[in-house]
Regions:
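Compositionally biased terminal segments of proteins
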Residues: 1-252
Length: 252
């Protein structure tokens, strides 16, 4: 559930974890939430589930309500990063430093700008910000504290990414399989919190995974696969239930 603190051990010498440690040290806590592939890895490590894939990028969802874009973009530049395609016609999205890549995004409806550029919008971002947990990442020599969407927030965010980003839909579905295996079941997920917009984000991905022979499930070991498929069924049942009028955490 949102607000919980977790301690996980991460391979501090394995990319891109060293970069995440560097960013956490350089930025103020609360200015961003970890999303994307490394978010999936954090949940998998917490739950003892094998991640489905390697990831090279660090994806940050900026909390503009608590900070400004410059609170993250400034430190990234100080670290030697430069924005990709630096012109006013394209949204700010990616910072690079050699082979290191950091992607930044904001929630819909936020008029966030940096260096006269708008910032890329991420679907289901508001609920991911609202449903954040705190993670202490313990490396071999140091630790950092960051924010990560809780299991439900991560699943909704990944389902939304699958719906809007069809460049590599299989990757998003594999990530969802891992997140469902890591979620802890119906009660731990807190499915009663699902709002109408959450359900809209979830339906396409749930439908895509209804076939238990889908390739996305094959990334999981047998026991984890059973747990994940049971979670998918529980989420699908919750999506089909009438939405409580007070459920507001999923609004964009």
């Amino acid at each position: 559930m949102a607000g919980t603190e977790h301690l996980i051990e991460v391979p501090e010498d394995q990319d891109p974890w060293p970069l995440l440690f560097e960013i956490a040290d350089a930025t103020r806590e609360g200015t961003w939430v970890l999303v994307g592939g490394l978010m999936v890895h954090a949940h998998a490590i917490r739950a003892g589930v094998a991640p489905s894939r390697t990831t090279r990028d660090v994806d940050l969802l900026l909390d503009i309500g608590a900070s400004r874009v410059s609170d993250v973009a400034g430190p990234l530049q100080s670290m030697g990063f430069a924005p990709l395609h630096a012109n006013s016609a394209t949204p700010l999205h990616r910072f690079t430093r050699g082979e290191d890549v950091v992607d930044v995004m904001v929630e819909p409806g936020i008029r966030a700008r940096w260096s006269r550029r708008s910032v890329l919008v991420a679907p289901a971002a508001r609920q991911a910000l609202d449903r954040r947990d705190r993670y202490v990442l313990q490396g071999t020599t140091k630790s950092v504290r960051i924010a990560v969407p809780d299991p439900l927030g991560a699943i909704v965010a990944k389902a939304a990414a699958y719906h809007v980003d069809q460049r590599d839909p299989g990757r998003h579905l594999e990530d969802l399989a891992v997140l469902m295996a890591s979620g802890g079941g119906r009660r731990a997920l807190g499915l009663e919190r699902l709002a109408r917009r959450d359900k809209q984000h979830l339906r396409p991905a749930l439908d895509a995974l209804i076939d238990e022979g889908h390739d996305a499930w094959s990334v999981l070991e047998f026991g984890d696969r059973l747990v994940a498929q049971r979670a998918r069924r529980a989420i699908a049942e919750a999506v089909d239930q009438p939405t409580r009028s007070r459920g507001a955490t999923g609004k964009m």
